């Protein structure tokens, strides 16, 4: 599959002095940024200013194309959960100067990618310190009859509820096990077709007592909403604005 990586460049002073471009004792914080249904690894760079924002914060951004897989190992299709949890992180960490510390690693996504951010983040809470959903189909158990994604190809014909593909059930199990839950940021436009679903998720998060931030405002399911939101999210994330120690 295809991967797009945004790697910030050094600031202008390197043109006029002998400062090394990349220091071996420094690493980038990293955001895994997920696309939605019918998207690919290019949608964030084509439709938002994420390259400029990443440069400002000295943040590495990684996006991968996963078709309409919902970021799981499809019953009839690619094994994208395995790819996103094992193969892609191993490639990124062995190829680029990226921090592997939990406090420097974040995951976010819009629409189907919001589901994916929860699915992957809750599967590896030891890897990610923050999970972000923008207009996400977080609770796909309630959405399976309202989507253009071919769910039988993705999940088969077995019920999703009370399985690892049921994000809210999975979250509840982790809490019961005493697992450290990543901080959560959830946002949705008030005119979005997923608004009511996000309200249900919000109420469940409040009920579970997790550490989460919720934001809503005028907007539908499009990039006019997601571009300003990703800027707000980058302000919310614990970004250093510079490289971190290796």
Locate predicted features.
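Non-catalytic cap/lid and distal C-terminal segments of serine-dependent acyl enzymes
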Residues: 1-246
